[in-house]
C-alpha cells in the first residue's frame, strides 16, 4: 500500500514538473517574445479609441471626447448599479474641484443606459461631465488593460496622451493625488 502511494506521489511530481516546463516554454511565442509582456495593452491605441468613442450626455445628445486632447484627464468608467462606483463619486467630485484650477479634466463614462444615467444624475448631481458610453464601454476599458471587466475603472491620461495610471476598483484619493500632482 505504501509503495503505491510513493509511486503515485512520484508520478504526480513528474507530471507537475512536465506541466511547469511546458507552461514556461509556452509563455514564449515563436519569436521568443514573452506572451505576458505582449499581452500588455497598447495604451496609445486605447487613447485613440477613447477620443473616437461615441458618447452622449444623459439627454442622449452626442458629445466628443476628442475635445479633451491636449489636456490631462481622469476618465472614470462607472455604472449606476455599481455600489463602489457610486461610493467613490464624492471623492472624485472633490478631486475634480481641487484639480480643475490646475487644468485637469475629469469625465465619468457610464457603462449603462441613457435612462439609468439620467435618473442617477437627477438623484446624485455630479459637478464633472458624465457621459454615456453604453455597454461598449467595457470593451474600451479592456483596451486600457481592464481584462477583468470590473467597475469602477479609472484611467489617468496626461496632456501628451500617455496613460499615467489605471485603477480597477475604488480610487484611493491619496494615491490619485500623487498621480495628478506628477502631471
Predicted regions, residues:
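Hydrophobic beta-strand positions
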Residues: 54-55, 156
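Short active-site neighborhood of thiol/selenol oxidoreductases, capturing the structured segment around
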Residues: 63-83
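Thiol/disulfide oxidoreductase modules built on the thioredoxin-like
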Residues: 122-128, 133-181
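N-terminal targeting signals for export/organelle localization
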Residues: 1-52
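Structural microenvironment flanking redox-active thiols in thiol-disulfide oxidoreductases
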Residues: 86-125, 135-142
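Active-site acidic short loop of glycosyltransferases
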Residues: 68-71, 101, 127
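Residue-level recognition of short loop/turn positions
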Residues: 58-61, 160
Amino acid at each position: 500500500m505504501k509503495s503505491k502511494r510513493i509511486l503515485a506521489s512520484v508520478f504526480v511530481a513528474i507530471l507537475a514538473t512536465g506541466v511547469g516546463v511546458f507552461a514556461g516554454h509556452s509563455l514564449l511565442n515563436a519569436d521568443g517574445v514573452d506572451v505576458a509582456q505582449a499581452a500588455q495593452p497598447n495604451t496609445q491605441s486605447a487613447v485613440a479609441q477613447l477620443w473616437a468613442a461615441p458618447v452622449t450626455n444623459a439627454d442622449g445628445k452626442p458629445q466628443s471626447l476628442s475635445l479633451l486632447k491636449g489636456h490631462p484627464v481622469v476618465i472614470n468608467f462607472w455604472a449606476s448599479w455599481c455600489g463602489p462606483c457610486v461610493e467613490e463619486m464624492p471623492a472624485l467630485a472633490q478631486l475634480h474641484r481641487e484639480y480643475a484650477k490646475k487644468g485637469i479634466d475629469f469625465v465619468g463614462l457610464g457603462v449603462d443606459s441613457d435612462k439609468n444615467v439620467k435618473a442617477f444624475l437627477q438623484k446624485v448631481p455630479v459637478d464633472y461631465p458624465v457621459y454615456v458610453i453604453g455597454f461598449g464601454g467595457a470593451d474600451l476599458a479592456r483596451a486600457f488593460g481592464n481584462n477583468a471587466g470590473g467597475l469602477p475603472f479609472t484611467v489617468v491620461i496626461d496632456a501628451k496622451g500617455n496613460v499615467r495610471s489605471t485603477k480597477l476598483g475604488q480610487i484611493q484619493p491619496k494615491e490619485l493625488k500623487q498621480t495628478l500632482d506628477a502631471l
